[in-house]
């Protein structure tokens, strides 16, 4: 599966900053010190109802991670999956009377268009769950043969008790885990499971549903969590720098993934930092496909909204915060974009070297994009109030905002 085209990232003068970021597993902001190649895995979409503003906010956060790393002259190895077979996708295709493969392809193509418009840097590896199945099957067999998984009526479940570190990613108690498991695709009440929290690794073929050859597992399809583990281990290996996604992925998805990886490799954790973006609400409720209260990037683009303004609306909120999309949020972003563009359109302006360092410092401090925006606001206000004589300043600001914030002025 191919990703989307990359926009050029301008090189900036001076030195980039090492990133400090909030790690869900430890509950604190930790320093990250990647090697020459920083490694990041971000969980991708289930391709229906793409791309809503919650999606966009999540991928914006991890785009900033990449930009901070690139500014330190590191290379970035970024992997993202597409959950292109899953119960919600199949249910949506059946509801709409369309082929599930066609639906997935259409929505994935739309997602790529939205990511391109928003100038999100693409992954080097963009992997669909379906194409990963040949690599998933032997992992499930290994877990079963090692006693870390068991069969139940043809399905294969992972035993959470096989991982002594289970629970150390989300830090939730058993009651909270059970509740979230039921809400987020698990089946804690299924009779016969060794532990209600045990997640499915391999679903035996069901009538009327797609299935694939599972060798000794029989025909079926993989569970959600093992898909990401297989893709991440194949392309990044253990101990990569960041695993990212929305805060609703901390449990069960990232917790279970870490357990699968530990049982397969004997190593923990799978990622050095588990980083989670906040939820975006509309009319007081979390924006979600199940509720249908969605604001789509593609709809805004069709309505003529500049994608740079959409990106500024996302950047105005700290990535870990929960926030609400409103008309006022977009109006503020449009006004900011106009102010910034007018400021950099002049032939000269106030010196900008200190501004570049302010943006770097803000982003290195747990991706504090609102502080970075405030710094640019101050420079733009000074430009409009008094101007300046530095002929290179507007260009420096444009390149810094492009390279570090992904906004083209």
Swiss-Prot record:
The protein's Enzyme Commission number: 6.3.1.13
Organism name: Streptomyces avermitilis (strain ATCC 31267 / DSM 46492 / JCM 5070 / NBRC 14893 / NCIMB 12804 / NRRL 8165 / MA-4680)
HAMAP family: MshC (MF_01697)
Cofactor(s) named in the record: Zn(2+)
GO molecular function terms noted in the UniProt entry: ATP binding; cysteine-glucosaminylinositol ligase activity; cysteine-tRNA ligase activity; zinc ion binding
Protein family according to the UniProt entry: Belongs to the class-I aminoacyl-tRNA synthetase family. MshC subfamily.
Top EC class for this record: ligase
SUBUNIT field: Monomer.
Protein name: L-cysteine:1D-myo-inositol 2-amino-2-deoxy-alpha-D-glucopyranoside ligase
Cofactor note: Binds 1 zinc ion per subunit.
Residues at which Zn(2+) binds: 43, 228, 253
Domain of life: Bacteria
Binding of L-cysteinyl-5'-AMP, residues: 43-46, 58, 81-83, 224, 246-248, 280
'KMSKS' region (motif): residue ranges: 286-290
Catalytic activity: 1D-myo-inositol 2-amino-2-deoxy-alpha-D-glucopyranoside + L-cysteine + ATP = 1D-myo-inositol 2-(L-cysteinylamino)-2-deoxy-alpha-D-glucopyranoside + AMP + diphosphate + H(+)
Reported function: Catalyzes the ATP-dependent condensation of GlcN-Ins and L-cysteine to form L-Cys-GlcN-Ins.
Gene3D superfamilies in alphabetical order: Anticodon-binding domain of a subclass of class I aminoacyl-tRNA synthetases (1.20.120.640), HUPs (3.40.50.620)
Keywords: ATP-binding, Ligase, Metal-binding, Nucleotide-binding, Zinc
GO cellular component term, pick one: cytosol
Chain ranges for the short sequence motif 'HIGH' region as given in the UniProt record: 45-55
NCBIfam families: mycothiol_MshC
Biological processes annotated in GO: cysteinyl-tRNA aminoacylation; mycothiol biosynthetic process
Locus of motif 'ERGGDP' region: 183-188
């Amino acid at each position: 599966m191919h990703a989307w085209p990359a926009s050029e990232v301008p090189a900036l003068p001076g030195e980039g900053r090492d990133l400090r970021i909030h790690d869900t597993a430890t509950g604190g902001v930790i320093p990250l010190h990647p090697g020459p190649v920083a490694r990041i895995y971000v969980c991708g979409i289930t391709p229906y109802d793409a791309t809503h503003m919650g999606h966009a906010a999540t991928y914006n956060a991890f785009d900033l991670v990449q930009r901070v790393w690139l500014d330190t002259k590191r290379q970035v190895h970024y992997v993202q999956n597409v959950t292109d077979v899953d119960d919600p996708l199949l249910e949506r295709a059946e509801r709409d009377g369309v082929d599930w493969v066609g639906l997935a392809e259409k929505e994935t193509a739309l997602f790529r268009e939205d990511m391109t418009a928003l100038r999100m840097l693409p992954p080097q590896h963009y992997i669909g769950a379906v194409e990963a199945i040949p690599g998933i099957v032997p992992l499930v067999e290994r877990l079963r043969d090692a006693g870390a998984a068991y069969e139940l009526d043809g399905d294969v479940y992972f035993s959470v008790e096989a991982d002594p570190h289970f629970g150390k990613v989300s830090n939730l108690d058993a009651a909270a885990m059970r509740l979230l498991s039921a809400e987020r695709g698990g089946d804690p009440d299924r009779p016969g499971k060794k532990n209600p929290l045990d997640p499915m690794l391999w679903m035996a073929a069901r009538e009327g549903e797609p299935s694939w050859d599972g060798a000794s597992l029989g025909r079926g399809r993989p569970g959600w969590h093992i898909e990401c583990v297989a893709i991440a281990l194949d392309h990044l290996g253990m101990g990569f720098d960041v695993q990212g996604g929305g805060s609703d992925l901390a449990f069960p998805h990232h917790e279970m993934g870490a357990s699968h990886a530990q049982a397969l490799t004997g190593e923990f954790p799978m990622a050095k930092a588990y980083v989670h973006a906040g939820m975006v609400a509309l009319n007081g409720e979390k924006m979600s496909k199940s509720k249908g209260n969605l604001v789509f990037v593609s709809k805004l683009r069709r309505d003529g909204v500049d994608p740079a303004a959409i990106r500024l609306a996302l950047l105005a909120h700290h990535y870990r915060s929960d926030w609400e999309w409103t008309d006022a949020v977009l109006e503020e972003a449009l006004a900011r974009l106009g102010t910034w563009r007018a400021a950099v359109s002049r032939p000269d302006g106030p010196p900008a070297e200190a501004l570049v360092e302010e943006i770097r410092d803000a982003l290195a401090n747990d991706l504090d994009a609102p502080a970075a925006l405030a710094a640019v606001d101050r420079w733009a206000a000074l430009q409009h109030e008094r101007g300046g004589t530095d002929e290179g300043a507007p260009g420096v600001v444009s390149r810094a905002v492009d390279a570090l914030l992904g906004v083209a002025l």
